[in-house]
Structure formats: C-alpha cells, structure tokens
From Swiss-Prot:
One of its GO terms (molecular function) is rRNA binding. Pfam families: Ribosomal_L9_C, Ribosomal_L9_N. Belongs to the bacterial ribosomal protein bL9 family. PANTHER family: 50S RIBOSOMAL PROTEIN L9. It comes from Geobacter sulfurreducens (strain ATCC 51573 / DSM 12127 / PCA). It comes from the Bacteria. Keywords: Ribonucleoprotein, Ribosomal protein, RNA-binding, rRNA-binding. Gene3D superfamilies: Ribosomal protein L9, C-terminal domain, Ribosomal protein L9, N-terminal domain. This is Large ribosomal subunit protein bL9. PROSITE patterns: RIBOSOMAL_L9.
Length: 148
C-alpha cells in the first residue's frame, strides 16, 4: 500500500514522501496516528498544492528577512556608558540594550536574536550579529562611548 507521509517517520521517510508500506502498518499505525494518508491522486494533488503554498510563504518570509538585514546593516548604534580611566565599562553592554536601541530606530528584534561574540566591556567599536532568519544574519555596528 502506498502512503503519503505527513510527519517524519524514522526508518521510513520525511514529510511529503510517498512510500510503500504493508497495508496493516498503514491502517493500524500510520493513518490512525495521523502520520500518513493514503496515496490517492486527490491526496497527491493536495500535497503538491500545500508544498507550493509553503514554498511561496517561505520565499516571502525570506525576502522580508533580507530587507530587514539591509535596513539593520545600514544602521550604526551609539551607546554611552560610564567607564573608568582606561575605557573599561562599569558593567557591560547587553543584547537587551541593543534591542531597545534598535526599537528606537524602528527595527523591532527579539533580544535573543542579537548575538555578541563576547561581552562588550570596553569603549570602542564592536560588531553584533543579528539573526533575523535561520538563513540570513546581519552585522550591526555598535559604537560605545564614555558617558560624561
């Protein structure tokens, strides 16, 4: 019996694969647990349609992410912190502060998507990576100055 997988099934296949299985395995395990549907012409067409819609949405989200990356890379954030004589900050610049500065610039990003290679604890220029999408990331320029 041929079935179309709706979930990834170990040792069988991935979502959307059409696989041949024993009729009992399909009727008693895969179909009742909603892991698969019977591979009919109608179901195959519905699967193709769903794949096209998913691909369209994925491309649209990716395009929006690329536009956001272009906007972020055009920005340079300036932040002033209290610092000692040698330029060492009292505390550090966190991704939460960077997220608030981005929000003030009109770019709303979750703080967890801002990755600092190392904590910013000195005055100077730094680069933070903003993971906008799993496939797209932006480099954000951060300038830290000493507060007077």
């Amino acid at each position: 019996m041929k079935v179309i997988l709706k979930e990834n099934v170990e040792n069988l296949g991935h979502i959307g694969d059409i696989v041949k299985v024993a009729p009992g395995y399909a009727r008693n395990y895969l179909i009742p647990r909603n892991f698969a549907i019977e591979a009919t012409e109608k179901n195959a067409k519905a699967l193709e349609h769903a794949k096209r819609q998913l691909e369209y949405k994925r491309n649209k989200v990716l395009e929006q992410a690329r536009l956001l990356v272009a906007k972020i890379e055009g920005l340079s954030l300036s932040i002033s912190h209290q610092a000692g004589e040698e330029g060492k900050l009292f505390g550090s610049v966190t991704n939460m502060e960077l997220a608030e500065l981005l929000k003030a610039q009109g770019v709303e990003i979750d703080r967890k998507k801002i990755v600092l290679a190392e904590p910013i604890k000195h005055v100077g220029e730094f680069t933070a990576v903003v993971k906008v999408h799993p496939e797209v990331a932006a480099n954000l320029k951060v300038v830290v100055t000493k507060a007077e």
